[in-house]
Amino acid sequence: MEEERILCEAIHYNDGNIHRNQPKEIESGFIIAGYRHDTCVYIKSLINSNLREVKQGFLTNKKRFVDGYEAFEIAQKAGQILDPELAKEKGKRLLSEDLW
């Protein structure tokens, strides 16, 4: 079985509606994915929508949306973190600059 890896940054925008083709754990709202979180924010600025909640996180190759803490564990296990010692000093929360 393939090891789970981080694919890209993502933000969960919860507008209270159910949308098709979202990651497994997203019950309502939608995901915008991008190379960096600010790319996701910019794309969202082009869309008009009422939001209840906004969460930054990451998408994995297993079609899951995970927060920065779970992403840190996944990326660490997969050897994706550029500077593991620096990442540990900042805390066990993955940031986009830890990957790219």
Task: Enumerate the language-model features and the residues they cover.
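Linear-motif-rich, low-complexity cytosolic tails and juxtamembrane regions
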Residues: 1-56, 60-100
